[in-house]
C-alpha cells in the first residue's frame, strides 16, 4: 500500500548468508534512494573501527629479553611469534583481561589449542599456528589478553611507571577489532510500483568471535546513539527555562477599585483599610457586616462581583501580604 509521500521506508533484515565460519553477507532492504550508500558507508566505518573485541597486549617468553631475539630450536624469531599471537581469536566472558600460559616441548607446531586457560576464556581458532619447534626445545610463555576496541599501538600504552616493568615483558600492538574485512554493495530494490529503491548488501569477514547479525546490531546502535545529539540539538544548546510560578494570583494584587463596586461599598472597604482584592477575600461575611454603613445589599454585591472572577469571601492566603505590597 502506497503511504504518504513524506514517509520514509523502513528497511528490514532480509537475509544472512553464511559463506564460511568467518564470513557472511547481510542484506537489508528496502531503502530510500541514496540511503544505501549513506548507511552502508557509515556502518562500514563503525564496523571496522568500533567493534569491541579481545587482543593480546603483553607477552613474556622464558629466556627472551627483547623482541629482536631468536630462540634455539624454534623456526620463527620473536617478532614472527608476536605477529602470530596477534592472529589469536579469543573471547572473554565476565572479565576484562586474562593471563594465559603456553608450555610445550619436543618438535612440531605449537597451536593456539595448546594454550592453558580457565573457563572464562574461549579460543575460537585452536588450529592457529603460533610457532614451530624444529628441535628438542622447551618453550614457556605467558600471554596477557584484554578487551578493547580499535587498534591501540604499544607505544600509546607506555606509561611513566613502565620503567619498573620487568625486562622481557614485551608489549604488543593490540588489534581489538573482530572485523578483519568489510565491504558493501548497493543494488536495486522494488516495492510495489516503486523501482528506484536501494538494497544494501554488507559482506563481512570476522575472526569468528562476533556474529554478523550482532555486529550489524551493535554498529547501528552506536550510530543511533551518536545521532541522538542532533535529534536533541535544541535541548543541548538551549537549556529549558523553568517558569517561576507567581506566589499569588495576579488578580489578588489588584486594587479593589478594579471591582467597580458602588461608591457606597467602595468607601466602606477603604474605611476598613481594605485596599487590595487579596485583602477583601480574606474577610468573612460576618466581619464585613460589622463594617459601618455596609449592609446586606452591599455584601451581596461584593459576593457577586467576586464570584464572577472565581473568588469568594473567607479565603486563606498564606504569606499575605507579599513584599511588594507590604513595602508600600
UniProtKB/Swiss-Prot annotation:
Catalytic activity: RNA(n) + a ribonucleoside 5'-triphosphate = RNA(n+1) + diphosphate
Annotated EC: 2.7.7.6
Name listed for the protein in its UniProt record: DNA-directed RNA polymerase subunit alpha
Organism: Shewanella sp. (strain DB6705)
Free-text function comment from the UniProt entry: DNA-dependent RNA polymerase catalyzes the transcription of DNA into RNA using the four ribonucleoside triphosphates as substrates.
Family, similarity comment: Belongs to the RNA polymerase alpha chain family.
InterPro entries (UniProt xref): DNA-dir_RNA_pol_insert (IPR011262), DNA-dir_RNA_pol_RpoA/D/Rpb3 (IPR011263), DNA-dir_RpoA (IPR011773), RBP11-like (IPR036603), RNAP_asu_C (IPR011260), RNApol_insert_sf (IPR036643)
Entries under Pfam families matching the protein: RNA_pol_A_bac (PF01000), RNA_pol_A_CTD (PF03118), RNA_pol_L (PF01193)
